[in-house]
């Protein structure tokens, strides 16, 4: 089995967890590759990773079935965007207190990898949503694509907001 690793290099916990993760992967004979952007961060910490293990997102998307995001939910979202054009299975290890998208705790990594290897998991379909703000003068402000949900809020309490919902450019509902 092969897996791609998409780490958040800004998370200090990554560096203390890294050795344990690699030991688990090696014990389970899981071949791993690391996103190319991570090279500088690992080298600056004197963490030796064979240069052939660093791969581009494009290479990983085309050659691997599984991608493991390591960090927080933001890291998961970045990985989801990076691999959105590829047919990969994305899961993640969260390095903080709570993870909604990166749902694997560090203490559960070995068990979860066993489930992945034996294909005893349930896939959860997620989708990217696009949104924009249509201003009164007709101009549009396009917002970044998001995963699964869009939260609509008001700048001022008590100010009315009207929302037109379109699905695939077809008007669905006004709120």
Please give the residue ranges for each predicted region.
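Short glycine/serine/threonine-rich phosphate/pyrophosphate-binding segments
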Residues: 14-15, 74-80
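Redox-cofactor binding/interface segments in oxidoreductases and associated redox assembly factors
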Residues: 69
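Catalytic core of DAGKc-family lipid kinases
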Residues: 98-175
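ATP/NTP phosphate-donor binding region
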Residues: 1-66, 107-122, 133-144
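Short glycine-rich anion-binding loops that position phosphate/pyrophosphate groups of nucleotides
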Residues: 10, 72-75, 98
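Gly/Ser-rich helix-loop-strand patches that form or flank binding pockets
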Residues: 78, 83-100
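Short, solvent-exposed amphipathic alpha-helical segments in soluble enzyme
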Residues: 19-24, 84-85, 166-168
